């Protein structure tokens, strides 16, 4: 096993109806005005956006909203979010969605407090400062809810780059497996596949004697093998979705990758 450091300070609230406490967590982590960032209409149609707004209002927290995040989040919406945050005096970014929404939120959070072009961070500049970010996860897949990573597509050339830094690691993440029960089977299956890919990326290593992380990865892979078909057969199976959601976080917060290369 190689030397390593491990830092994973995200606060997690896991379980049914936990999104109703979003306002409490925003205030706990220093937010006074919030950007609610989300993707498509499902967040609106399901009533989730209204519940999030109500939670913020209960805490007396003003907010602005910015929807429209697409898969492989685009730089154009990040610039729009940065401008909105600066104009409105936003000091906390709340992502409501999956990995693309969370990655876009992280980019907005970093860009808002930076004098230059946020794309500098996706060209190698270290991220040392950002607005705090919180998440409400709606699909178990990317693992961005517990990681310091973000990937954005630059629309000037349509290429993707990543950035990473503890400043953009979510301060809190709300994980309610019930929010994933309305996902189509295809998206659910893609999420399971994404989680397994993250695990294989860490499992395949030349580092010897990493028994703890070997066994941890194997346990998570077995969980995916067991729970994936189960949740496709019964999309309302809360327990299967709960296991998948927590495994997705563990697969990408690097607890499985320490001490190995």
Segment roles from a protein language model:
Residues 70, 96-98, 259-261:
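Active-site nucleophile and cofactor-binding loops and adjacent substrate-binding regions
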Residues 90-108, 138-144:
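Glycine/serine-rich anion-binding loops at beta->alpha junctions
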Residues 113-209:
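A glycine/threonine-rich phosphate-anchoring loop and its flanking beta-alpha core
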Residues 1-92:
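ATP/NTP phosphate-donor binding region
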Residues 11, 33-35, 63-64, 91-94, ...:
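Structural motif
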Residues 202, 206-261:
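Active-site segments that bind and position negatively charged phosphate/pyrophosphate groups
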Residues 51-52, 80-82, 101-114, 146-149:
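Short Gly/Thr/Asp-enriched flexible loops that form oxyanion-binding sites at enzyme active sites
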């Amino acid at each position: 096993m190689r030397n390593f450091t491990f830092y994973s300070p995200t606060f997690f609230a896991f379980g049914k109806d936990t999104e109703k406490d979003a306002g409490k967590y925003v205030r706990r982590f220093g937010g006074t005005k919030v950007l609610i960032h989300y993707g498509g209409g499902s967040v609106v149609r399901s009533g989730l956006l209204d519940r999030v707004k109500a939670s913020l209002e209960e805490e007396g927290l003003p907010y602005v909203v910015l929807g429209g995040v697409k898969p492989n989040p685009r730089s154009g919406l990040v610039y729009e979010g940065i401008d909105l945050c600066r104009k409105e005096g936003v000091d906390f970014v709340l992502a409501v969605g999956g990995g693309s929404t969370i990655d876009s939120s992280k980019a907005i959070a970093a860009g808002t407090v930076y004098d230059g072009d946020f794309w500098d961070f996706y060209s190698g500049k270290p991220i040392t400062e950002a607005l705090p970010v919180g998440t409400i996860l709606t699909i178990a897949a990317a693992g961005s809810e517990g990681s310091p990573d973000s990937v954005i597509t630059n629309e000037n050339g349509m290429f993707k780059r990543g950035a990473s830094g503890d400043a953009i690691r979510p301060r809190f993440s709300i994980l309610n497996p019930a929010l994933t029960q309305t996902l189509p089977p295809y998206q659910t299956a893609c999420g399971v596949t994404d989680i397994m890919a993250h695990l294989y990326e860490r499992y395949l290593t030349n580092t010897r004697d990493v028994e703890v992380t070997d066994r941890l990865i194997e346990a998570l892979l077995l969980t995916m093998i067991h729970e994936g078909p189960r949740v496709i057969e019964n999309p309302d199976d809360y327990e299967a979705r709960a296991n998948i959601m927590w495994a997705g976080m563990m697969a990408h917060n690097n607890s499985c990758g320490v001490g190995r290369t």
